[in-house]
């Protein structure tokens, strides 16, 4: 007979930890948006383009060097692409 996942204490504890990590991730994304908004404003004042493909490439290389796994390089690229695309969309009207 299979265990009931709704009453398994260890599973519940792991889900609570995951939920805490998800909240931390949400906070980090919101903080990132605040910082990028400031960068966008400063770049506008300097007459510099908001999107910088060279900086995005540098960021991927930097994060790839810092990544200790288990996230793969392909997974990192997908995550970063998603975050950058989301950031650009969120700040498009600002």
Model-inferred region functions:
Residues 1-94:
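Domain-level signature for soluble enzymes in the chorismate/prephenate branch of the shikimate pathway
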């Amino acid at each position: 007979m299979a265990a009931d996942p709704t009453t398994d204490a260890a599973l519940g504890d792991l889900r609570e930890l995951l939920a805490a990590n998800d909240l931390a991730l949400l906070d980090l994304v919101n903080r990132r948006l605040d910082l990028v908004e400031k960068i966008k404003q400063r770049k506008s004042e300097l007459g510099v383009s908001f999107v910088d493909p060279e900086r995005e490439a540098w960021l991927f290389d930097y994060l790839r060097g810092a990544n200790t796994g288990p996230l793969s390089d392909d997974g990192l690229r997908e995550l970063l692409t998603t975050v950058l695309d989301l950031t650009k969309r969120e700040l498009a009207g600002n």
